[in-house]
Design a protein with these regions (language model features):
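A structural boundary/capping signal
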Residues: 1-201
Length: 201
């Protein structure tokens, strides 16, 4: 049937244009979600849920308000907060920091997303380390001398932060062989760090 009514013709044209624009927007958005949240690690794909939003900034400020800019105090306070959140395996996609806090549980992915986000908004250099079936956070604390072994990535010292061990301390011992390390990731740029040299000493 031919459409003789001009109004209906223009309406259908308008609806078609809106549909096409919406479709293009969804494809464009999906591309950036994949680009910014998914990283290929060998045979698997890592999905990050890190945030630098107002919620994370306010929470980090609140948790470190009594530290007076003391870095060890800030990092340990944030680590204590995250490690006291109950560990529970999450069979779905990793949760955002806010979801971990509100639901009061998470696995290593979830709790590491929370910790690394809190540290990042305070300006710390932090990365994820992926090992078989686990993930942990590493932090560079500049010239602070802690009497603990550290992971040296390209000759730069990083202390291990373990989110699944209740009240663990900065400089948690490496429980894996160096050869088990699948990747070191900057989740805020969603890219793997090129590793030329890796030591634990």
């Amino acid at each position: 049937m031919l459409i003789n009514n001009k109004f209906l013709k223009y309406l259908s044209f308008f609806i078609s244009i809106v549909f096409v624009i919406n479709l293009i927007y969804m494809i464009y958005s999906s591309f950036f979600i994949v680009k910014n949240q998914f990283t290929d690690i060998g045979d698997t794909t890592y999905v990050n849920q890190v945030r630098e939003d107002d919620y994370t900034i306010k929470l980090a400020s609140y948790l470190t308000k009594n530290c007076n800019k003391d870095k060890l105090c800030e990092v340990q306070n944030l680590l204590d907060f995250v490690t006291t959140i109950p560990y529970k395996i999450n069979d779905s996609i990793a949760k955002s920091p806010k979801q971990v806090v509100e639901q009061n549980f998470g696995d290593c992915d979830d709790k590491s997303n929370l910790l690394i986000s809190l540290l990042k908004v305070l300006g710390y250099e932090v990365y994820f380390v992926l090992v078989p079936e686990h993930i942990f956070v590493i932090i560079n604390l500049d010239n602070l001398n802690i009497s603990k072994k550290a992971l040296y990535v390209n000759d730069k010292k990083f202390y291990i932060l373990e989110t699944t061990a209740t009240l663990s301390k900065i400089g948690f011992p490496l429980k894996y062989k160096l050869s088990d390390i699948e990747a070191v990731i900057d989740p805020f740029k969603n890219k793997k760090i090129l590793i030329n040299n890796l030591e634990y000493k």
